[in-house]
């Protein structure tokens, strides 16, 4: 559950609440994990999704976008993956990537892509609808035994390409997952 405008004292840093299922359903006592990014205006949690199992350890991972994250450029955006484990969510470390384009709003949309290349690992899609003066782009990161690694970028020629991203399942029945942008 995301609260991208959650104020931790700096203004709209954002917060994500993770609730674990059990034989009794979800806990009503509060979130099992609370994730946050201590940067004013980052809007951590603007987009959230299951990443699938990007590292093949048998546990689902979590994908979180912060489209107004700044690291040298205003609103370049970032995406974060927290890894699941048999002991629960690993919060002490995470994988992250960010845009190289000011104002791109990278991480505005995030989704599991399924297994696009058929290697047995889940892949993820990240949208940056304002990349390159609003043309937009998506980045597809491929899962591996080491987590997310190599990537493929598609740059749009249309306004806000990457505004929404999703897995499409296997549209043509060839055994590979497809995506929707």
Protein language model features and the residues they cover:
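Conserved beta-strand/short-helix segments
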Residues: 1-181
